């Protein structure tokens, strides 16, 4: 029973659009009643109806240590005692900036903001200001936040301008946003051939987290780096999801590619609202007050958020942190796949350290957006609700990645696998491949 969640959801819809403050939370993609959470600890969520869930959302990625980690809570509590916001510099800003640069050497200077959207939006403004060019290239299926210039659908052909994907976004705002195909270098090269003198930057997720985790092919990212070098454009990695999750140095360290700018978020705030963008010194020096490109924020560098973020990043330096996280992720995903195969369930998966994507499809590998959107959404909805009913909380969307934390143990992973095995063994026939 979810009586209290249902009552709160009904009440919330009187005061907030859709009853939520971020659309995916409304369960619109899966149906049913969104769970209202009252407490979280380690790998678990507890809702207002006192039901406990193994959590594979992790607040959409920030909670790499698990919920309510003692070191993070202590750091935030100590910071709160000194005040919630100063509107002035604090020492922890310097400490966090230095640690970010230590983890990601491509970031020689960094600017703190309050969200991933602010980070990508500001990085693009900086790229345009530095290059004196107006156009940017993004990729179909990659999500970089809700800034107007990034809410774009692909046009009717590879060389067309983008079209707004949301009412309220003026056509003129997105006409400088060019859309290419992820993992298709030829589509990018074609845009450069036509608009070579106008392209300020490419922005890309090195591992795309909002089309159910599709990693870039290594030669694809290498090719993007080479095209940017050739045409004098900047390469921006959106590592809001992957930064400090897939590796201490982010996805860029796995691919051994140095972007000009990097957008960060989620983990760097330890669960607090934080984003950041940084990169080469000579580029970052063009930001005000040193340079002419303006960007500011009342709550940027908030002392409580800086303390929580600093405490989180320090924990990531523990011995074998990432090898242990990767091992747990692999145990979970390979266990799911083996159970799906045994039950003849059409399922494939992509995963990296601490993050995974499940797609109900008979295709063995999913490497393109077109493949991801052709996954069976109805199968996912059924799977999602069966998991939820059995105490496992997944992202309420067939296109969102799942996350696993350092707080998850083999106990939680194995319990999850037992639940999945049972679900697959009794699932409706429409979940099975014909044999």
UniProtKB/Swiss-Prot annotation:
Superkingdom of this protein's organism: Bacteria
Pathway involvement? Porphyrin-containing compound metabolism; protoporphyrin-IX biosynthesis; 5-aminolevulinate from L-glutamyl-tRNA(Glu): step 2/2
Xref: InterPro entries? 4pyrrol_synth_GluAld_NH2Trfase (IPR004639), Aminotrans_3 (IPR005814), Aminotrans_3_PPA_site (IPR049704), PyrdxlP-dep_Trfase (IPR015424), PyrdxlP-dep_Trfase_major (IPR015421), PyrdxlP-dep_Trfase_small (IPR015422)
This protein's UniProt keywords: Cytoplasm, Isomerase, Porphyrin biosynthesis, Pyridoxal phosphate
- Reactions this protein catalyses: (S)-4-amino-5-oxopentanoate = 5-aminolevulinate
Where is it found, in Gene Ontology cellular component terms?
cytoplasm
Which of the seven top EC classes does this enzyme belong to? isomerase
GO BP field? protoporphyrinogen IX biosynthetic process
**Matches recorded under CDD domains:** OAT_like (cd00610)
Output the Gene Ontology terms for molecular function: glutamate-1-semialdehyde 2,1-aminomutase activity; pyridoxal phosphate binding; transaminase activity
Q: Where in the cell is it found?
A: Cytoplasm
EC number(s) per UniProt? Answer: 5.4.3.8
Post-translational modification N6-(pyridoxal phosphate)lysine, affected residues: 266
The protein here is known as: Glutamate-1-semialdehyde 2,1-aminomutase
What organism does the UniProt record list as the source? Coxiella burnetii (strain CbuK_Q154)
Q: What lineage does the source organism belong to?
A: Bacteria, Pseudomonadati, Pseudomonadota, Gammaproteobacteria, Legionellales
**Gene that codes for this?**
hemL
């Amino acid at each position: 029973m979810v009586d209290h969640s249902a009552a709160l959801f009904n009440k919330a819809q009187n005061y907030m659009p859709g009853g939520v403050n971020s659309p995916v939370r409304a369960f619109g993609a899966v149906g049913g009643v969104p769970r209202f959470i009252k407490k979280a600890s380690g790998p678990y969520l507890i809702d207002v109806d006192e039901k406990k869930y193994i959590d594979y959302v992790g607040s959409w990625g920030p909670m790499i240590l698990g919920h309510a980690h003692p070191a993070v809570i202590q750091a935030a509590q100590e910071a709160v005692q000194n005040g919630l916001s100063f509107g002035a510099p604090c020492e922890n800003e310097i400490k966090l900036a230095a640690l970010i640069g230590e983890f990601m050497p491509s970031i020689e200077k960094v600017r703190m903001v309050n969200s991933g959207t602010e980070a990508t939006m500001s990085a693009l403004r900086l790229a345009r200001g530095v290059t004196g060019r107006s156009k940017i290239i993004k990729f179909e299926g990659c999500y970089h936040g809700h800034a107007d210039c990034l809410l774009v659908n692909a046009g009717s052909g590879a060389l067309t301008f983008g079209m707004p994907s949301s009412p309220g976004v003026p056509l003129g705002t997105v006409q400088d946003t060019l859309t290419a195909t992820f993992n298709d270098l030829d589509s990018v090269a074609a845009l450069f051939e036509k608009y070579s003198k106008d392209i300020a930057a490419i922005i890309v997720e090195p591992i795309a987290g909002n089309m159910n985790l599709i990693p870039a092919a290594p030669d694809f990212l290498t090719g993007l780096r080479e095209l940017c070098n050739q045409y004098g454009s900047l390469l921006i990695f959106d590592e809001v999801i992957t930064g400090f999750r897939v590796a201490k140095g982010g996805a860029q360290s796995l691919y051994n590619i140095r972007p000009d700018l990097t957008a960060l978020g989620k983990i760097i705030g330890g669960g607090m609202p934080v984003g950041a963008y940084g990169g080469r010194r000579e580029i970052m020096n063009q930001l005000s007050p040193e340079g002419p490109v303006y960007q500011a924020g009342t709550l940027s560098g908030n002392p409580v958020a800086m303390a929580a973020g600093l405490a989180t990043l320090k924990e990531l330096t523990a011995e074998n942190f990432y090898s242990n996280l990767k091992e747990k992720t692999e145990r979970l995903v390979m266990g799911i796949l083996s159970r799906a195969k045994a039950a003849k369930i059409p399922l494939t998966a992509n995963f990296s350290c601490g993050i995974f994507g499940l797609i109900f499809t008979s295709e063995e590998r999913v490497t393109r957006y077109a493949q991801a959107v052709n996954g069976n959404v109805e199968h996912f909805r059924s799977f999602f609700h069966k998991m939820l009913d059995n105490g496992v909380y997944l992202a309420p969307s067939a296109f969102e990645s799942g996350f696993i934390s350092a707080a998850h143990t083999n106990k939680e992973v194995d319990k999850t696998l037992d639940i999945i095995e049972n679900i697959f063994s009794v699932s409706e026939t429409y979940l099975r491949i014909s044999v």
